[in-house]
Amino acid sequence: MNILFFITPKSEVEYLYDYYTIKEAIDKIENNDYTSIPVINEKGQYEFTITEGDLLWKIKSNYENKKRGDKVELIETLTIKDIDKYNDYKTVSANSNMENLITLATNQNFIPVVDDQNIFIGIIKRSDIIAYFNEKLNLEKSLKIS
């Protein structure tokens, strides 16, 4: 099966640019009720996926080391590329196979899809993969009953 059947295209995906500040990242994650979000560079290439946990750990570690007046400035000046990532979201190419998708989906709630130049073209959501196989399983069950 072609994995592009599952893709949510970039035009329908919220993402961040790597030069965004921590505040901009938090705002976008909060406004969309996400726990993680893909990050691309100005060329449109996938860089990494940032999670709520990555942001919180960075804020906590820097917050404790700053004077009171500098604490608000922290989230408005540090960019997300300055943050350590605790989860390494793997990508797949558009011509990848279902086995790769399933393997990655066990640990990632979405899989970023890139082309041959690492240009971000969209995501495949774990929920879409599960829904597809659930539907297929239910169809097979109904055929056996008939």
Which residues are covered by each model-predicted region?
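Regulatory sensory and allosteric helical modules in signal-transduction proteins
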Residues: S61, G69, K81-V92
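Short, solvent-exposed cationic patches
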Residues: N65-D82, K141-S146
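Bateman (tandem CBS) regulatory domains
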Residues: M1-V13, I75-D88
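Acidic (E/D-rich), amphipathic helical modules within compact regulatory domains
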Residues: I26-D70
